[in-house]
Amino acid sequence: IPSSNDMGRPTLEGGRSVHPLMRDEKVAELLENEGQRRITRAYTEEAVRFITRNRDRRFLLYLPHTAMHVPLFPHTDFAGKSNNGTYGDWVEEVDWSVGRVLETLRQLKLDRNTLVLFTSDNGPWASKGKAGGVAGPLRGSKGCTLEGGVRVPTIAWWPGTARPGTSHDGIAGT
């Protein structure tokens, strides 16, 4: 999807709001809202294929999920899996996705030679209530310069190099 998943465009065929799912520079499929339920899985499987195809050479995989951005459309396999409603269900699905990518790296014996960074770009969308996420004890949200709007996690995974359980208080940008 070339834009945020809340920015669908009307089609010429009836004015429905759709989201173009791209493969390289071509539209592979036009997704209506409910079609977004398949997108995390589609991105994940494409990432696994990419890793497998490129396992014998250096690669950079950039996997920017549209998940956890309103409107919320977790796959039906994850419906009701969390105690935090639809937003939490989509968090569960992204957790599955990251696990699938990490497992692929392990199976191909690439895990000790691959740095994986997991991060976010902003805090929750306060105007959407719980459906937009929560910043916990931090004040502020998306579009705000308070900590709740700009402080996001960054997790580094690199077995044998990045020591588990360590943390750093340095500043980074996404």
Where do the PLM segments sit?
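Formylglycine-dependent
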Residues: 1-59, 65-74, 156, 164
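Acidic, His- and aromatic-enriched active-site or binding-groove loops in soluble protein domains
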Residues: 1-7, 91, 136-142
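Solvent-exposed loop/turn segments at secondary-structure junctions
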Residues: 3-5, 66-70, 96, 122-125, ...
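Substrate-binding rim/cap in mid-to-C-terminal beta-strand-loop elements of soluble/periplasmic
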Residues: 14-15, 19-29, 99-108, 127, ...
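Loop/turn elements at helix/coil->beta-strand transitions in domains of secreted/extracellular proteins
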Residues: 55-61, 110-116, 150-152
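Active-site-proximal beta-strand/loop segments in catalytic clefts of secreted hydrolases
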Residues: 64-68, 73-76, 119-122, 150, ...
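Active-site-proximal segments of metal-dependent phosphoesterases and phosphodiesterases across multiple
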Residues: 81-95
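Metal-dependent active-site segment of extracytoplasmic phospho-/sulfohydrolases and closely related
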Residues: 93-130
